[in-house]
Amino acid sequence: MSLFRRVGIIARLDKPQILDTVKKLMEYLQEKDIAPVLEDQLATMMPGVKVASSALKELGDHCDMVMVVGGDGSFLGAARAICNYDIPVLGINRGTLGFLTDISPHNLQEELDPIFRGEYHEEKRFMIEAKIKRQNRPSGEGIALNDLVLHPGKSARMIRFDLFIDDQFVMNQKSDGLIVATPTGSTAYALSAGGPIMLPKLDALVLVPMHPHTLSNRPIVIDANARIRIVVCESNLTYPSVSCDGQLNITAAPGDEIHITKKAGGIRLIHPKNHDFYNVCRDKLGWQSSYRP
């Protein structure tokens, strides 16, 4: 008998082939006497299908596992929505890179059978949260699995800000912004900005400057439990934004303080038993694959 009896399904909605994959997934689950629970918007895209559905934010109340059909962006959105539930998440890749979505849509049964027999690898990925204070009052907040990014928003101007770690002054920086990335996010935007790749199991964060005016400003790897404080200097003529996984933007103002910390809990990510992070890097990043001893 499967360890999972009710499986929530979240999917990207803009591609017909994704709905085809969802239908195949539902048939697979029902054949195994596992009840699928569709996210509400997905359910509206599949008229005539008689299965349970739920609002995204409440999906974790109705299932003991969630499957995401889409790419890394879909997975990130799902992670933020269900992160307060202690349920595992599995990704079926219908995107491009697919660092977080391991299962091929072309081999569903072959790749899912072992997982529903309990033959899988599970790892915990932590998340981070940002809280913006304006004149010591809350102004906005957001969470991220990949990264929180301070950027100019709609303006092409550089930003000047002060950076503090655990209340110790680090630097005053003038740049296009700052990426604060988790190990999960180290292979995303932070990597393209010159940051290092971090193993997913590391309890660390990387701070990556974006086009700093001082060329000696380099990425810094810090303890994941450190308290980061960014003060947007009063001299700025623009209102920068804080982006959460590139999907949610919060506007900051000159004088605002941005507090970034590790979020309690996290995401339980399911991988196939043979999952290998270095193999994923070779495949997704185009590393040389031949071994020459």
From Swiss-Prot:
List residues binding NAD(+): 72-73, 146-147, 157, 174, 176, 187-192, 247
Cross-referenced InterPro entries: ATP-NAD_kinase_N, ATP-NAD_kinase_PpnK-typ_C, NAD/diacylglycerol_kinase_sf, NADK
Q: What is the name of this protein?
A: NAD kinase
Q: Organism, per UniProt?
A: Marinomonas sp. (strain MWYL1)
Instruction: Provide the E.C. number(s) assigned to this enzyme.
Output: 2.7.1.23
Give this protein's Gene Ontology molecular function annotations.
ATP binding; metal ion binding; NAD binding; NAD+ kinase activity
Cite the NCBIfam families for this sequence. PRK01231.1
- Cofactor section: a divalent metal cation
Ordered alphabetically, the record's keywords are: ATP-binding, Cytoplasm, Kinase, NAD, NADP, Nucleotide-binding, Transferase
What the record says about family reads: Belongs to the NAD kinase family.
Tell me one GO biological process term. Answer: NAD metabolic process
Q: Which SUPFAM superfamilies match?
A: NAD kinase/diacylglycerol kinase-like
GO cellular component assignments: cytoplasm
Residues the record marks as active site: 72
Which compartments is it annotated to reside in? Cytoplasm
The record's annotation in Pfam families points to: NAD_kinase (PF01513), NAD_kinase_C (PF20143)
Described by its record, this protein's role is as follows: Involved in the regulation of the intracellular balance of NAD and NADP, and is a key enzyme in the biosynthesis of NADP. Catalyzes specifically the phosphorylation on 2'-hydroxyl of the adenosine moiety of NAD to yield NADP.
User: What is catalyzed by this enzyme?
Assistant: NAD(+) + ATP = ADP + NADP(+) + H(+)
Reading the lineage from the top rank, the first entry is Bacteria
